[in-house]
Amino acid sequence: MASKKAGGSTKNGRDSNPKMLGVKIYGGQSVTAGNIIVRQRGTEFHAGANVGMGRDHTLFATADGVVKFEVKGQFGRRYVTVESV
């Protein structure tokens, strides 16, 4: 009488979709209002002048201009600003 035990379950076999994080527009490049500059988890970069922050910490331009990255403050925070041309 042939018999076969039931196959066990596995805890693997899943993967999440890529989130496409990172800097989208680099320093010196021009932007128009609404363009996404950085997609990030948390505040790796902070919003400076003419830059807004979405609820998922995405930084976007609020005015037309040129992107500038700078390190400021006692804690070495990295800020993204948009300078009007």
From Swiss-Prot:
GO terms for molecular function: structural constituent of ribosome. One of its GO terms (cellular component) is cytosolic large ribosomal subunit. Keywords: Ribonucleoprotein, Ribosomal protein. SUPFAM superfamilies: Ribosomal L27 protein-like. The keyword Kinase does not apply. The keyword Oxidoreductase does not apply. InterPro entries: Ribosomal_bL27, Ribosomal_bL27_CS. It comes from the Bacteria. GO terms for biological process: translation. Residues 1-20 are annotated as: Disordered. HAMAP family: Ribosomal_bL27. Belongs to the bacterial ribosomal protein bL27 family. NCBIfam families: L27. This is Large ribosomal subunit protein bL27. It comes from Acinetobacter baylyi (strain ATCC 33305 / BD413 / ADP1).
